[in-house]
């Protein structure tokens, strides 16, 4: 079952997964929309996406899947719609906004804070942060990410509580 994206102020509640779909890798975020916080997040190879979402579904029933409408989203919808209702969100510009959102969550420290934000490069892949941006766009409000920033080049997993 597929439904269009909700207007700002969506009343989604409970546990929701967000997916920034891609051909080779996907950003995934699991959030408790009732509490307004991120539970966990990962960047996984595309072929591991369904397995990760099914594992989350077994732990806590998903109320919805929020997914970007770009790269191969129609293909992903067919694979994921059995887990929960899929709600598409316009993903235009989310990669650039994910970079800004990264620095909002984890402000630069030391000499890096002297660099203009546009010149700062986050120390991890941003696919999970892009999934966060998609979910926040859909909800019309920011979510709280209470864990330390991801670190290290080539990082595949974004830590969460």
Question: Language-model features: where?
Answer:
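Phosphate- and other anionic-substrate recognition elements at nucleic-acid/protein interfaces
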Residues: 1-161
